[in-house]
Each structure stands twice: as C-alpha cells, then as structure tokens.
Amino acid sequence: MAAKIRRDDEVIVLTGKDKGKRGKVKNVLSSGKIIVEGINLVKKHQKPVPALNQPGGIVEKEAAIQVSNVALFNTVTGKADRVGFRFEDGKKVRFFKSNSETIK
C-alpha cells in the first residue's frame, strides 16, 4: 500500500504535547511512525565515546511520532487535510480531499 505521508512532506501535529505545530518529515519508519523536524524533542543522555572523539552530555533529538497523530498540511487552505489516491496518465498520485489538488 502506498504511503499517504512521505519524506519531505509538511505535516501538522493533531494530538499530544506538540499539537498545532508544523514540521517537515525527515524519515518514515516501517513501524507506522515518522520523525518530524523540531517535533517531539526528547533529551537523551549520551555517553562519551573517546574512540570516535564524541563528548558525552545531554543531547536533544527528535523522537518518532505515530503517523495517525499527524496530518498533511495543505498550504492552499492553511489547514490539515486528508489525502486520497487517484490515477493520472497511468500513474498513481496523491491529492488533497478538500480541494482535489494534486500533491507535488
């Protein structure tokens, strides 16, 4: 099945501590989760690795978020939108359900 949310899409968070924030999808994981730029930041306690010359300390990084907790952001309407699929010229393309505009 084709993914409704893909890498480099702009999404908006629907639920959780980051509700309403927008960001760009950095990575889509096979477990039904995505990593979004600047969203769901967690602090990780990193051990130093002298062999790689990496210092230790507390590092802030993005954690994965469930795909069901985000929606694609429609720049035309300025709101979260649902995604559908259709065939155009023999190719399967994604489109916004609110205004039927093709995505990328």
From Swiss-Prot:
Q: Its Gene Ontology biological processes?
A: translation
Taxonomically, the superkingdom here is Bacteria
Listed GO cellular component terms? Answer: cytosol; ribonucleoprotein complex; ribosome
What's one GO MF term for it?
A: structural constituent of ribosome
Q: Which keywords accompany this UniProt record?
A: Ribonucleoprotein, Ribosomal protein, RNA-binding, rRNA-binding
One Pfam annotation reads ribosomal_L24
What family classification does the UniProt entry report for this protein? Belongs to the universal ribosomal protein uL24 family.
HAMAP family linked to this entry: Ribosomal_uL24_B (MF_01326_B)
Q: What protein name applies here?
A: Large ribosomal subunit protein uL24
Species of origin reads Enterobacter sp. (strain 638)
